[in-house]
UniProtKB/Swiss-Prot annotation:
Locations listed in the record: Cell membrane
Record key words, sorted: Cell membrane, Membrane, Repeat, Transmembrane, Transmembrane helix, Transport
Listed transmembrane segments: 13-33, 44-64, 71-91, 121-141, 148-168, 177-197, 203-223, 244-264, 269-289, 296-316, 320-340
The keyword RNA-binding is annotated on this UniProt entry: no
Protein name as annotated: Uncharacterized transporter MTH_841
Topological category with respect to the lipid bilayer: Multi-pass membrane protein
Length: 343
């Protein structure tokens, strides 16, 4: 039986990534024991890596929102994940591959072989994280603001904890219940926009709930991906998941007769999400895990939601009210409490 303070914290690290995208990694890959010489610089690079990853991931909602002005959600999802898959497979064929894999894996603690049953789990999680979840997210994003969408994604950690408890019987500490309550309080305000009287007639509220539904499917992917987390070649697994999702969405696009055009002016935004928000964030997060530990990365990565709201406010000129800010901070506090180990 897994223990939440250890294993589940490691799981959350990947939540967002693969949240847009990948899978979880148990805390056992955390490698904070740096040698004395250069230890400070290694930890510094670890913090720089995770902050950079949060910025890259945070801007994704804003870039998606811009693309929604000219493209269908299915089209955006298809091209985004196809490009991400190409990028990850490209990285896998470069010398950077071994550096990334060595940062992820500990000698003797990873499995080199991917079994037949693993491919079934890989297919299932690919459908959850790169087909269903992005469709819900992009459709919801079209009806709400990127500010709200970024902040609402924090409910992923709540779903991961609840699913971990229900499926794997993860143990919860007293402080975890406080964190859960804070996340729920912040989410309730953001989901309803503080107006319960018009909740059923408010299009923006519908969009908010679609974003929350996307967060659920991404969290389900994270929990189920536990069965893949000990594989050595996680770049391959991530590339397969992205590619499967992209091509499934492409098939859906063709069957439904959706416009397949990727406007030239939208190409930089699609590349930004695919290469930086998905691909580079994936690599940077694992580097950070190696240098500063999974728990610290898990506590810092939710800052991506705050960066996302700030980007939407500055670039899209979306409203960012004081109450939205307070709700976001309340949720971030809840996430931090869930990851805080008292050390």
């Amino acid at each position: 039986m897994l223990s939440y303070p250890g294993e589940l914290q490691g799981c959350r690290v990947i939540l967002y990534l693969v949240g847009h995208h990948l899978y979880l990694i148990p805390t056992t890959i955390s490698m904070c024991g740096c040698p004395e010489e250069g230890a400070y610089m290694r930890r510094l690079w670890g913090y720089i890596s995770i902050i950079t990853a949060t910025i890259f991931f945070g801007i994704s909602a804003t870039l998606d929102k811009i693309m929604l002005s000219s493209m269908h959600p299915v089209t955006i999802g298809a091209y985004t994940y196809i490009i991400a898959g190409i990028f990850l497979f490209f990285i896998r064929e470069t010398p950077l591959r071994e550096h990334v894999l060595n940062a992820i894996n500990r000698k003797g603690e990873s499995e080199a072989r991917i079994k037949r049953n693993d491919y079934l789990i890989l297919l299932l999680t690919a459908l959850l994280s790169t087909v269903i979840a992005p469709l819900l997210f992009l459709t919801g994003l079209g009806d709400t603001t990127a500010v709200n969408a970024s902040l609402i994604l924090n409910v992923e950690v709540l779903f991961i904890i609840l699913l971990g408890y229900l499926i794997f019987r993860e143990t919860l500490q007293l402080k975890d219940f406080l964190g859960i309550v804070l996340i729920i309080l912040g989410a309730v305000y953001l989901l309803t926009e503080g107006d319960f009287s018009t909740i059923l007639r408010n299009v923006a509220v519908t969009g908010n709930f679609l974003v929350m539904a996307a967060a659920f499917f991404w969290s389900l992917d994270t929990v189920l991906s536990k069965f893949l987390s000990r594989k050595r070649d996680l770049i391959f697994i991530s590339g397969v998941k992205s590619s499967v999702g992209g091509f499934v969405l492409l098939i859906i696009m063709l069957i439904l007769g959706i416009n397949t055009e990727l406007p030239l002016e939208m190409l930089p935004y699609a590349l930004g999400v695919s290469v930086f928000s998905i691909g580079c964030s994936f690599i940077l997060i694992y580097i950070a895990i190696r240098e500063i530990g999974a728990s610290m990365v898990g506590a810092l990565f939710p800052l991506s939601s705050l960066f996302g709201a700030i980007f939407a406010f500055i670039i899209l000129r979306e409203p960012f009210s004081i109450m939205q800010g307070i709700s976001g901070i309340v949720m971030l506090t809840g996430v931090f409490i869930l990851y805080w180990n008292g050390k």
